[in-house]
């Protein structure tokens, strides 16, 4: 626009809203503002009495700083809660923390340099509590810095006395229904952590293990197998051979007895070719053939112990690998244990809590199990029982806490019997909406196939298992009275009291053993699995808090929680209530780099959200979260974050343009009714209305990437590239009180008021900043206190949409023609052009009904002629039929004020450098 004596007559944008966001400095100021007005309480008061939407927070672990996975999770939750609280719901959000468990124990040990076995239990637990609470406070501030709104002053903690008290009641109710039992079973065991693990605490990684073929000499062939034969097994865990008591065959498979180099071997016929190739058997002779069931109860010698190994039958045997004759150690495998129970095999597990062999393993005593592989192989070789030893890389279970390989180990543990409520849990799954829908099958299959839940842990920092044992007969005691007593004690004192008091002090007065009548008891020393802690949160949080209710509307966590929190919560809820604790379950993927790799310090691809917030601002991270289809793994890198920052800049500039052009607009006095708006203005409201409908549906469907792309496209294309571009002359050059200018300002005002609300769930900080410049006296103090914009059927004018769609199609042809003319130096700015549109009759009729073509195309003159008169050089655009455009340099003088070239420039003697429109405006302004 003009730079000269008429500058002061232009309505140039005026706003204090800065172009540069400066988010790292601005956002903390907004956080302070929210704290000062107590935004969470204000919103709860506003929404009191409305229908509720309860998103129950899955508790993050109180250990370390937050990472991008936390960011993705918490921002997704915050987007949902903010949307719900602005769209007619009472949507409280109570953040929580998982505060017990092994990692906190390990950190307390590491930080203090103490030996937990030599430290007073209560003192050690105090150190653990201090560590957990320290990181609760650290993470709390980090989550708040992301703009996440919640009841940060009163979160739920699994270590709080109230939570622990209710958890005891959950355990007691499950025990009362017969779902809790103690049994000897193989469980996942971590020797490094010295405790049992649940399935949810196990992850699988690649591991190189031995791969050996071993001979078991036949001792008693039961008249079927010759006594000079050998049964061949294959295993990748030689360390389990000291616990071998059986060899399992499939009853329906064919087995062959063959002779190789003077020795007779038994193996499955279906694996003969593979084994022969592996062992280098060039010449062998098949001597006999059997069904697996014919070989049942044949007895073999153990390869190096004076012990029998019984041939048993099991459906779990496959022909995928090995020999079809499966080494069976009931003390070290689930299938082995079950088949061993069926045949009465001895359960041998000669391994201590640290994963080292006991005296029962004889010559291997003291060896760490994984280190013992070499010694076992040497023993087999010495006894000529080894056919081959090699290595294999395969998936192996690891402890997800310490990242060390784990073992199966038969020990006495407390279990929750999934069989007791499995069918009810499977039925409950189909009452829940799973987002994405594949989540249903995933958890259904896990519940259907999972074994009983090992809920005991041999550690210190956790909620004790509230069981007493009779000193006289050893029977366990748990009943309504003991549970009520322990629950009350925990509510008043926390679970430390279990370790500080004797059994007699913890039990109700007058307790006696229900089995033998004894009156002296000892306490259970194990604690509960932390998944039982968080799995009880629906009872410990949703039930007692007045602002919440059971069940919740939504659980939202990473896809690994189908086997974790979703699973444990479903189990406890179905066991107690017979129903799921949630109505919807939404899962997101993991954060990966641009190549799809996990975040890893060794790969150097870790993106730190705290650093990103310090450098770029939390709103950029929030926009990144919204831009991704979180149902898959979510990619992040400096380049991707840069793209989010660029998208943010465009959205911010759009809002700044609107704010700048509303500086002299009073919506209370100057609004223009819809019927008096120009067709272009009505088109803008139509596009806004469609945006409101699309964005609202996308929020309802949790498709936040659709929200992002719709808003971004609206700002950059519909507004910046089209509406604003066309509007600038009217806004800047018309008389300030011009009716058409006020009409445009009315539309801009409605657009920004809708945009600022729809942006709030995502751009929490920037929307608040925008609102601070937009709000009028008497309006809501915070943008978060506003209501969601409503669609308006009056704006859905199909005729306008169709007509403007065609006109904008033509605008593309004109733009292309202007670009070509500019490249040929025919014109400079588009206002230096006259255009001639050669149109078909259909186009001619449409364009004659369209006012202000010059303004739409931003040229000085637009002339309409029949298509038949088009010269050969007139430009046509592929896909746009019936239109050709010619561009020529405009003739006449350029208006100094608006830059339009037209013949009226010079006609006004007082303002000879202005066009007629500008001369009249200036005259009015100067009085």
UniProtKB/Swiss-Prot annotation:
A motif ('KMSKS' region) lies at residues 598-602. Binds 1 zinc ion per subunit. Monomer. Its main location: cytoplasm. L-isoleucyl-5'-AMP binds at residue 557. One of its GO terms (cellular component) is cytosol. Its cofactor is Zn(2+). It is found in: Cytoplasm. The gene is ileS. GO terms for biological process: isoleucyl-tRNA aminoacylation. PANTHER family: ISOLEUCINE--TRNA LIGASE, MITOCHONDRIAL (PTHR42765:SF1), SOLEUCYL-TRNA SYNTHETASE (PTHR42765). Catalyzes the attachment of isoleucine to tRNA(Ile). As IleRS can inadvertently accommodate and process structurally similar amino acids such as valine, to avoid such errors it has two additional distinct tRNA(Ile)-dependent editing activities. One activity is designated as 'pretransfer' editing and involves the hydrolysis of activated Val-AMP. The other activity is designated 'posttransfer' editing and involves deacylation of mischarged Val-tRNA(Ile). A motif ('HIGH' region) lies at residues 60-70. It comes from Syntrophomonas wolfei subsp. wolfei (strain DSM 2245B / Goettingen). This is Isoleucine--tRNA ligase. GO terms for molecular function: aminoacyl-tRNA deacylase activity; ATP binding; isoleucine-tRNA ligase activity; tRNA binding; zinc ion binding. Belongs to the class-I aminoacyl-tRNA synthetase family. IleS type 1 subfamily. The keyword Zinc applies. Its EC number is 6.1.1.5.
